């Protein structure tokens, strides 16, 4: 009977065949231990010399790392393993023998591993991170579908930039200029006027020359836009979403979190409502903590965000940033028009901003004024301005960076480990 490592638990004391790769092995004179993986998990195969044909035991000792195999044997309980079971191997069939696999069991430097990212993905820890990434995506769709959102796919090639910055990848679109999308927000706002609540999930591109552990050039973003929703209501949806994702990973990725040695007690504390601190109060807090490199009207750097998040040891919303450091489309704060109705959600443990969101300007005259103040081409944003001409309503939106969120939940040091093939400042290969 053919099965997988994950499904093998349903076949205790039965003979099964599993297609797998050999990740490592060790042997004594009488027993060989094969570390097997098949994409669904990792399992040990035990080959006892006295219980198999001589050729099988010889093969078990000689087979090379990352060779592909069909392994047949009996699934037995083993409380010492992460899975709780292993295979007593009876026969081995080599599908393809690997030669001189470059990533050996010894330690390798990061650059070497990134050069061999196509192979590094096979390792136990990298496999665990990708499984957690997959669960975050699955839980995302579950949350938005259950809450009545419609998925919309905004274009990746655009003629304008929602952030109004110069950090764009430029390309030619026949005889026109085009850019790789920084965000689908403007298109999602249009879709929200048709469907009420919408979300998207796709790649975004930032031509930022950043080399921090938080930054990728290409990353995936989950964005939501909601009509007839105010800023406070949007924050509630955001914290419910993040809490749902964290709980889903805790429930469905126990083994992966164990492999990564993640301190799950920190994740178990994540619950609504999240703490909130205004930008003004955050500045005062940082001053009281001895930070003299930040003044009102300046954006926070990584050390500032880390200090604020560590104070709460939970995801925390920093709200109502100064108007001058935020994009043109954010709604003024009626209590202080020098600030806007926005919030960044900062993850604890130094992972930084994972969500940025705001209430959007819904008044045509004000939005036209903002477009001019930011030096933007009004014609390029004419479709966006149309949304305020024809039945404008209060509405809000936000975007969550997938890789930073996965890094935080997984506890990995750098976001490069949370993308299958990360695009970094000096890396376009593999």
Curated annotation (Swiss-Prot):
SUPFAM superfamilies for this protein: Class II aaRS and biotin synthetases, Nucleic acid-binding proteins
- Which species expresses this protein natively? Staphylococcus aureus (strain MSSA476)
Its principal location? cytoplasm
Quaternary structure? Homodimer.
According to its UniProt record, where is this protein located? Answer: Cytoplasm
Family membership:
Belongs to the class-II aminoacyl-tRNA synthetase family.
Write the protein's name.
Asparagine--tRNA ligase
| UniProt-listed Enzyme Commission number(s) | 6.1.1.22
| Catalysed reactions, as listed in the record | tRNA(Asn) + L-asparagine + ATP = L-asparaginyl-tRNA(Asn) + AMP + diphosphate + H(+)
- Keywords annotated in UniProt: Aminoacyl-tRNA synthetase, ATP-binding, Cytoplasm, Ligase, Nucleotide-binding, Protein biosynthesis
Protein biosynthesis as a keyword of this entry, yes or no, is yes
Q: Name one Pfam family in it.
A: tRNA_anti-codon
Q: Which InterPro entries match?
A: Aa-tRNA-synt_II (IPR004364), aa-tRNA-synth_II (IPR006195), aa-tRNA-synth_II/BPL/LPL (IPR045864), Asn-tRNA-ligase (IPR004522), Asp/Asn-tRNA-synth_IIb (IPR002312), NA-bd_OB-fold (IPR012340), NA-bd_OB_tRNA (IPR004365)
Source domain of life: Bacteria
Asked if the keyword NAD belongs to this entry, the reply reads no
The entry lists its GO molecular-function terms as: asparagine-tRNA ligase activity; ATP binding; catalytic activity, acting on a protein; nucleic acid binding; transferase activity
Return the broad EC class.
Answer: ligase
Which PANTHER family does the record match to this protein?
A: ASPARAGINE--TRNA LIGASE, MITOCHONDRIAL-RELATED, ASPARTYL/LYSYL-TRNA SYNTHETASE
**Gene Ontology terms describing biological process:** asparaginyl-tRNA aminoacylation
GO cellular component assignments: cytoplasm
